From Swiss-Prot:
The lineage of its organism: Eukaryota, Metazoa, Chordata, Craniata, Vertebrata. This is WAP four-disulfide core domain protein 12. It is found in: Secreted. Its main location: secreted. Gene3D superfamilies: Elafin-like. Disulfide bonds join C32-C60, C39-C64, C47-C59, C53-C68. Residues 25-72 form the WAP domain. The keyword Signal applies. One of its GO terms (cellular component) is extracellular space. One of its GO terms (molecular function) is serine-type endopeptidase inhibitor activity. Antibacterial protein. Putative acid-stable proteinase inhibitor. InterPro entries: Elafin-like_sf (IPR036645), WAP_dom (IPR008197). It comes from Rattus norvegicus.
Amino acid sequence: MWPNSILVLTVLLISSTLVTGGGVKGAEKGVCPPDNVRCIRGEDPQCHNDNDCKDQKICCYWHCGFKCVQPVKDSWEQ
């Protein structure tokens, strides 16, 4: 019972981190903004990495696909 509880807790913690989008780095430009959109199907990617983006934007999973978006300040860094 104990190992199963640890596994469930670990999975919940990881998935909550992925859903909020926190901590996804975009070089030194900032981090990806939170994306709470639930998708039925994904869109074709508009970028594959930050080098594909212009105007200080970064490549993030945003609204069902990878897109160049304006980064936000990382609230964990002071």
